[in-house]
A protein has these predicted regions:
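Charged DNA-binding/catalytic regions of mobile-element recombinases
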Residues: 1-178
């Protein structure tokens, strides 16, 4: 038995703004998930999606047109057209706790709840300066980066010979998604 995982991902912060697990692909469920995500996090300028039947459906297309959102879809038969989403799904599938099978739809949903809580609030992502998606999404990453810089400055001041050539700096924050 396979279940379908729907994920709405903010590609700038890598924050999963909404998700659900369903027994089958459903265009109305995809539309409802997008409405939920946009109701909480605002209406984006662009929604980039795969070419699955639910994301190319009339209900989803009409919702995006009504909201003035530009639709963008992956190229046909190009699996790596959305590296942000691909990275999130790889992190999910390679998580040590990812089971071989789910006993039920409820089990799959419970796993998704736990995983995306971890992913958003604990997982340090190299593409966003080793911050959590939540810290970038909610704007606390700049302060955290400043604290990291202060720690590195203190380490450099205490022992400059430990560092070659120049003082260390923390990884940079993203400035633009695409």
């Amino acid at each position: 038995v396979y279940y379908d995982l729907y994920v709405v991902l903010d590609i700038f912060s890598r924050f999963v703004v909404a998700f659900t697990v369903a027994a089958s692909e459903d265009s109305l469920l995809a539309k409802e998930l997008l409405e939920q995500a946009m109701g909480v996090h605002g209406i984006p300028d662009v929604v980039h999606a795969d070419r699955g039947t639910s994301m190319t459906s009339k209900p989803v297309a009409q919702l995006l047109v009504d909201l003035g959102v530009t639709r963008s879809h992956s190229r046909p038969r190009v699996s790596n057209d959305n590296p942000y989403s691909e990275s999130a799904f790889k992190t999910l599938k390679y998580a040590p706790a990812f089971p071989d099978t789910f006993g039920s739809l409820a089990d799959a949903r419970a796993f998704a709840d736990r995983f995306f809580g971890y992913y958003n609030h604990e997982h340090r992502h190299c593409g966003i300066g080793l911050h959590t998606p939540a810290s970038v999404h909610y704007g606390t990453a700049t302060e955290i980066r400043a604290q990291r810089q202060a720690t590195l400055d203190a380490a450099y001041t205490a022992n400059p010979t430990r560092f070659r050539h120049r003082p260390p700096t923390p990884p940079k924050l993203p400035t633009i998604a695409w």
